[in-house]
């Protein structure tokens, strides 16, 4: 089956055909590092991590660029407010501190590092070059009030609105700059002239005067700098579709770049049925989320909904994810113990880097616009079938299903047995539990051999009360947690 992705520009499912055979270039709008990361940031980054992993599984060489917006009105304003409250942190220090918070949160969730992670402040020259081309082509104009602002002339670009299918007359005024010298209220800032009272370190020299770039031009410059004038996929949150992505597309095309061939947008997060927002006071910060559950559980939850749908967070959401992941983990543990020492023992992972094959139904789901919910259904069906095979003593079938489950969780990045999810505290606890349970099982076996069935039954009952299930078979006794 051919991979199909929902292209926001055409509002349709399209067969994915890379610009260069065997290679994929992806640009994802990263965070504006003004304040601590929240669940919405994590959900977006994880959606494109799933896409990247699936493309890599299909044998494509993926270059993923995720930017850091480290210069912006919000960054400057937050630093100023901190200083007014008695702090000393400069805007650039705030941006770097918050950037590290994002990096730690991404790493905790197993989100693969991007191929490139450029900061906006490192591409000022590329931004000015695009602005210069737009001015030369008649699609941008310097303000005539001496402010140093440069605006994109929306009236000069008839295709403006093509991404969101809006008519120019229906669009709202651009809210990213003062309207002091705009020709049209929809025109947006490409370059913002320095204002009195702003830190000198937040301005760069330019042909139009000292200032800093507008938000939209930053992504146009960084994407084409690292991926070229035309690249495969541009991704980001649904809330960026307008005006940010609409403006990116317009200014890039007007400057002569073909730009992105596919546009993907992930859905937002709702908390107790309400859209998450600072104004409602219902933001869920990454640090709190990661403190409330194991990171792999958080990753499972964030990636369990279709990437284009709204992700609903409620009080029991993480508990449900924990239960689902526990079913996977206990099957993998149980099957590993049952198969150990048999001819069906799990083989070590291939050393040539080739991923293990996933079931056809799983691949079909992922090829259908990354239908992760359907892929997870295939995964859990395999877990149930694997447990049934173990119950029936069919080790060959159990081994086959274990291989399927292992391949699927590896592709999704949620293998609960992977070293990356084993914390320093997990390892000793697991070893201690295993030693204690196996010691009691050995005592039970000794009692059975001595025909002391009362003691053997008492040991079984004690373990059952602790959530340990014992299964007796001709090959010996095996144990599992919580009714594996």
UniProtKB/Swiss-Prot annotation:
A motif ('KMSKS' region) lies at residues 275-279. It catalyses: tRNA(Cys) + L-cysteine + ATP = L-cysteinyl-tRNA(Cys) + AMP + diphosphate. Zn(2+) binds at residues 29, 219, 244, 248. ATP binds at residue 278. Its cofactor is Zn(2+). GO terms for molecular function: ATP binding; cysteine-tRNA ligase activity; zinc ion binding. It is found in: Cytoplasm. Keywords: Aminoacyl-tRNA synthetase, ATP-binding, Cytoplasm, Ligase, Metal-binding, Nucleotide-binding, Protein biosynthesis, Zinc. A motif ('HIGH' region) lies at residues 31-41. One of its GO terms (cellular component) is cytosol. SUPFAM superfamilies: Anticodon-binding domain of a subclass of class I aminoacyl-tRNA synthetases, Nucleotidylyl transferase. GO terms for biological process: cysteinyl-tRNA aminoacylation. Its EC number is 6.1.1.16. Binds 1 zinc ion per subunit. It comes from the Bacteria. Belongs to the class-I aminoacyl-tRNA synthetase family. Monomer. This is Cysteine--tRNA ligase.
């Amino acid at each position: 089956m051919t991979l199909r992705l929902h292209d926001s520009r055409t509002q349709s499912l399209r067969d994915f055909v890379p610009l260069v055979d065997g290679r994929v270039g992806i640009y994802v709008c990263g965070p504006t590092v003004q304040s601590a990361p929240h669940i919405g940031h994590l959900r977006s980054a994880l959606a494109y991590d799933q896409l990247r992993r699936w493309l890599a599984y299909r044998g494509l060489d993926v270059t993923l660029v995720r930017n850091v917006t480290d210069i912006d009105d919000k960054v400057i304003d937050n630093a100023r407010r901190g200083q007014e409250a008695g702090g000393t942190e400069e805007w650039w220090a705030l941006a770097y501190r918050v950037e590290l918070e994002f990096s730690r949160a991404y790493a905790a969730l197993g989100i693969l590092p991007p191929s490139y992670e450029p900061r906006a402040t490192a591409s000022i020259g590329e931004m000015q070059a695009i602005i210069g081309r737009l001015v030369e082509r008649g699609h941008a104009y310097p303000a005539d009030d001496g402010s140093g602002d440069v605006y994109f002339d929306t009236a000069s670009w008839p295709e403006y609105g093509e991404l969101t299918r809006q008519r120019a007359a229906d669009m709202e005024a651009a809210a990213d700059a003062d309207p002091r010298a705009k020709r049209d209220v929809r025109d947006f800032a490409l370059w913002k002239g320095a204002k009195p009272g702003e830190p000198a370190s937040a301005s760069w020299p330019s042909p139009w005067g000292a200032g800093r770039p507008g938000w939209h031009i930053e992504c146009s410059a960084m994407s084409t700098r690292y991926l070229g004038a035309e690249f495969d996929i541009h991704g980001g949150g649904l809330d960026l579709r307008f005006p940010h992505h609409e403006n990116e597309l317009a200014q890039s095309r007007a400057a002569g770049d073909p730009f992105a061939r596919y546009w993907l947008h992930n859905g937002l997060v709702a908390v107790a049925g309400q859209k998450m927002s600072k104004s409602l006071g219902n933001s869920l910060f990454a640090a709190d989320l990661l403190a409330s559950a194991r990171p792999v559980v958080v990753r499972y939850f964030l990636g369990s909904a279709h990437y284009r749908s709204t992700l609903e967070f409620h009080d029991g959401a993480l508990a449900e994810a924990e239960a689902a992941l526990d079913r996977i983990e206990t099957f993998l543990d149980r099957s590993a113990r049952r198969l150990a020492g048999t001819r069906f023992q799990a083989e070590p992972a291939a050393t040539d880097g080739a991923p293990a094959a996933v079931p056809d139904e799983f691949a079909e789901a992922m090829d259908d616009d990354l239908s992760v919910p359907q892929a997870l259904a295939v995964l859990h069906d395999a877990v149930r079938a694997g447990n049934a095979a173990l119950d029936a003593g069919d080790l060959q079938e159990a081994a086959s299903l274990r291989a399927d489950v292992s391949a699927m969780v590896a592709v999704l990045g949620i293998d609960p047995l992977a070293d990356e999810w084993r914390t320093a505290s997990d390892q000793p606890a697991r070893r201690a539990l295993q030693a204690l349970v196996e010691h009691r099982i050995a005592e039970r076996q000794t009692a059975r051999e001595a025909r002391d069935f009362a003691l053997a039954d008492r040991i079984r009952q004690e373990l059952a009360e602790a959530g340990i299930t014992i299964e007796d078979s001709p090959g010996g006794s095996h144990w599992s947690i919580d009714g594996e």
